[in-house]
């Protein structure tokens, strides 16, 4: 399935053909924002921590730029990957754990990010992983994985924009679900812990069938 205005052939390439993997990093500043393996969940940055260089863990080495992609090398099936978008206009340095592969591409970063999150790419990653409890892939093996991609920048943009919009809709729906779940928990607590005397179940329910049908529910809520 493709957008109708595009017809050129897709090309086969390895990740290292279209991106720099773990590019040389600048020197760490005295303080920086650190992204560890627990900070990212399904593409979202869930935790931000500012730390001092002398207190930083040894894994804090990858200085990241805007639009750099972080690929989770440990348990990559979780797909906790992240594309970095600068959250402020200051010169604050951002540093990622070496548990991520840092990917800097000249193609559309959003397009490559979505490509790396596909099931097909993930399967190729998993067969190259070592370890059972914590399967992991090293950056050198990740760089050699081959895949088809469109070299057309306009097509890359349209594909990534569509997938971005879908992700935004999913994120919005998930937030609505979280709020409804919180509301349900609050109502349940109020209804079950309101201090009213306990009553027998048979005094408040009328059970006519083990299978609940819509027409069995009375206007009073009994069934």
Regions found by a protein language model. Name each.
Residues 1-13, 146-188, 196-197, 201-202:
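Amphipathic alpha-helical segments
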Residues 2-25, 193-223:
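Non-catalytic DNA-recognition/assembly elements of restriction-modification systems
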Residues 9, 34, 63, 94, ...:
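Short aromatic/basic micro-patch
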Residues 19, 23-55, 211-223:
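DNA target-recognition patches
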Residues 57-58, 131, 153, 164:
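Short, solvent-exposed loop/turn positions at domain surfaces
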Residues 58-121:
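A short beta-sheet element
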Residues 77, 92-98, 130-154, 211:
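A short glycine-rich beta-alpha junction/loop motif
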């Amino acid at each position: 399935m493709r957008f109708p205005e595009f017809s050129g052939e897709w090309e086969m390439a390895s990740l290292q053909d279209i991106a720099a993997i773990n590019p040389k990093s600048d020197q760490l500043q005295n303080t920086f924002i650190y992204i560890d393996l627990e900070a990212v969940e399904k593409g979202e940055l869930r935790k931000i921590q500012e730390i001092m260089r002398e207190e930083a863990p040894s894994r804090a080495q990858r200085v990241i730029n805007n639009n750099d992609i972080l690929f989770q090398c440990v348990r990559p099936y979780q797909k906790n990957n992240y594309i970095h978008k600068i959250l402020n206009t200051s010169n604050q340095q951002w540093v990622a754990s070496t548990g991520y592969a840092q990917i800097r591409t000249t193609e559309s970063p959003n397009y490559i990010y979505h490509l790396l999150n596909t099931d097909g790419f993930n399967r190729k990653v998993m067969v190259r992983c070592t370890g059972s409890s914590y399967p992991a892939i090293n950056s050198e093996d990740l760089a050699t994985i081959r895949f088809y991609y469109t070299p057309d920048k306009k097509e890359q943009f349209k594909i990534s924009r569509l997938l971005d919009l879908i992700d935004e809709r999913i994120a919005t729906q998930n937030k609505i679900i979280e709020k409804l779940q919180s509301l349900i928990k609050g109502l349940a607590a109020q209804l079950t812990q309101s201090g009213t005397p306990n009553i027998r179940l048979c005094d408040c329910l009328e059970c006519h069938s083990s299978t609940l049908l819509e027409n069995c529910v009375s206007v009073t809520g009994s069934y």
